Amino acid sequence: MTAPAAAIRRLDAREPEFLATLDALLAFEGGADARIDAAVSEILRAVRTTGDAAVLEYTRRFDHLDVKSMVQLELSKSELKAALDSLTVEQREALRVAADRVRVYHERQRAESWDYVEADGTRLGQKVTPLDRVGLYVPGGRASYPSSVLMNAIPAKVAGVGELIMVVPTPNGEKNPLVLAAAAITGVDRVFTIGGAQAVAALAYGTQTLPQVDKIVGPGNAYVAEAKRRVFGTVGIDMVAGPSEVLIISDGSGQAGWVAMDLFAQAEHDELAQSILLCTDAGFIDAVAASIERLLPSMPRRETIAASLANRGALIHVDSLEQACAIANRIAPEHLELSLDDAEPWIGRIRHAGAIFVGHWSVEALGDYCAGPNHVLPTMRSARFSSPLGVYDFQKRTSIVQISEAGAQTLGRVASILARGEGLQAHARSAEMRLHDR
């Protein structure tokens, strides 16, 4: 079989039209798909109306599982343990090491309640409370990712979520033991073998068997993403993620083959994934391009990689690392690699990135699985205003207001003036009724 061509655009940041070309390269519109929109709308309506019956029907239709009740689609704790026990020693150890590292990192994120007391006895504070119940969607079939279980379940558990319910499709009854083992290791409370928009609907609205959750997290296909988008407001969601992204900043000090493979690691996700190199050394860019040509034929997913690099990839020559950092902040990538011998001084120049991987040894793939920080990161330039998934996404904050009698005298007058200025007389009088000299 002929290997696919490894075409990837070459750009020069000194060209007058560079920024316009870059913005066009970055532009990604998922686009409204009328077929997906209509299908998801009908599925949500059916599940909301009939509950278990609709979920069973869609599971029969899409996953080819013909069961009589939702009880048959729930896995027991013993089944999860059996999946864990079925793994090789190496697989079990890898899952445990990764889980431990993710847990240690996320334990540092746990927010605590606080308060303070003013001179007149007024107490103000913030109460931090974990969510009661969270739903975790995990893809099934060919796209089975135990790492997604670790990255979503562990921060929820660290936050103290009361109940964590996982849904994972099992087409034709095929279960992925790594995914179920990850659920066992992380302490997922309940697991249902359902998927698609019907699983999102069941989590969002509740059914006769599956209770309504407060928030839904986890990746999925276009139907899952659209369902999450539609149920937002009824429940919380983590994000609606776009294609995976990596941006590598290099001064030519690394190994070209390493950089090429790091670009591949994103490109193999799908044809819309984005892999970009910013480099000050034109000769090194040539070496990376040559490495891409040399290494691509050996990759099992070479067709996907080639299409991704051709569609949305770029090798960009920049004048300086200062310019590279400015461009990086414009891109606001999901993953940013500082592939530099002396990377530390440049961390402070980066304002917008989901995660920064510092130095030649900090390969992004380690962050996907076992470094510790979360791999659920903002995409599509949303790192300008959003953050990685973390413990804080599974906690909520409540303000505590305890006004003393003395405090009510001072604050009551302030509130009265402002309320009357807004034309809200009941607000003003409510405050004034607490005043001693009213």
Swiss-Prot record:
Protein name according to UniProt: Histidinol dehydrogenase
Q: Which residues bind Zn(2+)?
A: Q266, H269, D368, H427
A GO molecular function term, named singly, is: histidinol dehydrogenase activity
* Gene Ontology CC terms, in alphabetical order: cytosol
Which keywords label this protein? Amino-acid biosynthesis, Histidine biosynthesis, Metal-binding, NAD, Oxidoreductase, Zinc
Known role: Catalyzes the sequential NAD-dependent oxidations of L-histidinol to L-histidinaldehyde and then to L-histidine.
Q: Which reaction does it catalyse?
A: L-histidinol + 2 NAD(+) + H2O = L-histidine + 2 NADH + 3 H(+)
